[in-house]
Amino acid sequence: MVDQRRSALGFVLLLLCLVLFFDCVVVGQTQSRFSEKLILLNLRSSLGLRGTDWPIKGDPCVDWRGIQCENGSIIGINISGFRRTRIGKLNPQFSVDPLRNLTRLSYFNASGLALPGTIPEWFGVSLLALEVLDLSSCSVNGVVPFTLGNLTSLRTLNLSQNSLTSLVPSSLGQLLNLSQLDLSRNSFTGVLPQSFSSLKNLLTLDVSSNYLTGPIPPGLGALSKLIHLNFSSNSFSSPIPSELGDLVNLVDFDLSINSLSGSVPQELRKLSKLQLMAIGDNLLSGTLPVDLFSAESQLQTLVLRENGFSGSLPDVCWSLPKLRILDIAKNNFTGLLPYSSYDSDQIAEMVDISSNTFYGELTPILRRFRIMDLSGNYFEGKLPDYVTGENVSVTSNCLRNERRQKPSAICAAFYKSRGLDFDDFGRPNLTQPTSKNASSGISRRTVIILAAVGGGVAFILLFVILPIILVLCMRHRRRAAQRGNNDRPKPAGEASQQPPKGAQTFDLSRLGNAFSYEQLLQATEEFNDANLIKRGHSGNLFRGFLENGIPVVIKKIDVREGKSEGYISELELFSKAGHQRLVPFLGHCLENESQKFLVYKFMRHGDLASSLFRKSENEGDGLKSLDWITRLKIALGAAEGLSYLHHECSPPLVHRDVQASSILLDDKFEVRLGSLSEAYAQGDAYQSRISRLLRLPQSSEPSSSGVTNAICSYDVYCFGKVLLELVTGKLGISSPDNALAKEYMEEALPYISTNEKELVTKILDPSLMVDEDLLEEVWAMAIIAKSCLNPKPTRRPLMRHIVNALENPLKVVREDTNSGSGSSRLRTNSSRGSWNAAIFGSWRQSASDVTAVQAGATTSGGGGGGGGNGLRNSGSQGSSGRNNNNNGNSSSSRRRQSSEIVPEPAAYGVVEDNL
């Protein structure tokens, strides 16, 4: 009996202990979860995040966005795409100290969220469980802490698209579990650490768009699992290591835009899985190995452009089964095109073999390409049917009956040097003797023909040259009058820095500092190729540091190459125009007769083309890019700069080179317009002058000669392509050299409609994370882009109206709901409908339809001939109302309709018709 009581008592005590134990566990978990919730609330406060994402009353593991838990503990935080409160937006900081106590945290993603500041040292001390760290596009600056090498569990490290500087820490070579490493689009300097050779699990290595120098470490050949390798846009030198041929799993191989030298290693033939090989824009030379690619190669893109390759291109390169792009332009390749046939399923996108020395006849192998640039070679014979159309360029060859070909003497000499015959474009040999009678007959006909041709030429010359002489005389008289009004003594020391004789005169004392040639030599290390940023059409750009350590960009212009007109125009522009949206001009050096130098402030984020796009770390084709807020900021900044040139300069200035690469970005992504050497006063280009005199119709597109007419609507068209590039994330839409841009725009524009917002998601950059409000802003920008891309120049909006629209994007797509009366709503709908019709209704109309729309717009304006002016004034009132809200004018305080933000283009169409 006693034993039974003892057993029962023991069982009760055991049960009591278990209850107490589980109670302690539950209490501990509750306290732990509560403390972690407090940590996240502190993080929300320090980063200024909105409470709707992390509400105080919710359970972080259940109700909070971006939180991942395991066994009740927080192990993952994703705040990418989060929006800040109004106060949080005013002063964003890298303030994440509360994370220090989340020792089990294995995932942290803040990509796209502005975190200006340096990465804390304690990241590599307190967060040792981290497996994923993504701080891409976070405005992080400073150096990468050496302690990150302690995060040995790390599998993904993405620090791309920031402002990180100094050396890449060698301690990153200790992250042996790392599979994704992306350091692209920063300002890293120095050499790539040899310790990276230890990262044997690496699948992606991207250090593109930095300032790295020195050789590529041969030890990288040991990274046998590597799939994506991108070292482009740096200053790597020395030959390509043959050890890279051991990367047998490599799919993407990009070493373009560096200073690599030597020949292509034979060992690269082992890269049988390659889909992309880009080694263009280097100093490579020699011949390509014949067996570099096999007939079973998976290669889709081959870029060898702008090197010094010679010899023949291996025949297999033309018939690669999956080839889409072949770009070998600007080399010394030579030989005949192969006569091999192709499979009809092997249609490729583009081939660019321009500026080489290929010769002979064009062969059927070209049938597989949709877009072809064959210019600058020595092809002869007749142009085949399959090499025609607007997507083909064959200029500067030796083709028969084609325009803009090389002189026959040059072609004959080229073929003679190779022991080949040339038929002189198929013309008969005029040196053969003829009979006396035939000679007499030909002579009489010749006299008649020459007389007729001579008379016609004389008439044309009189009709064309006389107006030109009159215009030049008037301009000369006007300039003389201006010089008479502006004569003054020149400052001391200015004489040595005068523009060349015959140039437009301007005041150099207002153009920044006059640098000496020795200063610029020292700043650029004697213009070392390692400091070369890019070769531009108006001069080569070098990075450098002045004596006081200020980073600068120096444009080197070779006057002997005929580039003097561009720099003179640029100096004249800077002497007369000044605006915060133009690239800061620091000075010049004009003391050298054959070379001139212009000095600009260094833009830390380069240009839009290099800051917007980068390859995704995934194997897909997606692009990862700037967040939407930054894109809209860039679009507005560029529009403000162009609006200044168009509307605040007299006469209006046309930029003529608006594209992503001419939109420069400082360290805060503020826009500065560059590439100003092409700027002209509206209507001042030579062809435009002739068109005005003869009343010929003008086009806003480049002419066949490559000269663009200087009218503001051309800038608007190009700006529309930039906006479309920002919306879609498609690389190179705004580039004038991109042959695919026109085709893509024709495919994308039907998805832009003022009536259906969801359509725009079909072309939206997939890397953008946007909520409903932001999607409406995207929609609005797409609508503005489409209006800019109207094929009729007179129906494109003015740039100042585009600025208003980008400042108020939601008003472009939202109807006014503040008005209560039916008549007000009717006016709103009518106004919006007119704007829709102005943008889209005439997209495919003829010129007569445009006139009809203009007449209708004038009539609806309710004032006879004043309808157009009324629309223009409404836009101006809206702008002034934004700056003077207390003037008592009710019209300035009401919400503007979409047609007021960007008035109907028909209202100002007459102005451009008279240009």
From Swiss-Prot:
Pfam families: LRR_14 (PF23598), PK_Tyr_Ser-Thr (PF07714)
Cellular component, GO annotation: plant-type cell wall; plasma membrane; plasmodesma
SMART domains xref list: LRR_TYP
Record-annotated active site: D657
Glycan attachment points: N71, N78, N101, N109, N150, N158, N177, N230, N332, N391, N429, N437
Protein kinase domain residues: 527-811
Biased composition (Low complexity): 871-892
Biased composition (Gly residues): 859-870
Major localization listed first in the record, in broad terms: membrane
Bilayer disposition of the protein: Single-pass type I membrane protein
Disulfides per UniProt: none
Residue ranges of LRR repeats: 102-125, 127-150, 151-174, 176-198, 199-223, 225-247, 248-271, 272-295, 297-320, 321-344, 366-390
Catalytic function, reaction form: L-seryl-[protein] + ATP = O-phospho-L-seryl-[protein] + ADP + H(+); L-threonyl-[protein] + ATP = O-phospho-L-threonyl-[protein] + ADP + H(+)
Keywords: ATP-binding, Glycoprotein, Kinase, Leucine-rich repeat, Membrane, Nucleotide-binding, Receptor, Repeat, Serine/threonine-protein kinase, Signal, Transferase, Transmembrane, Transmembrane helix
Protein name: Probable LRR receptor-like serine/threonine-protein kinase At2g16250
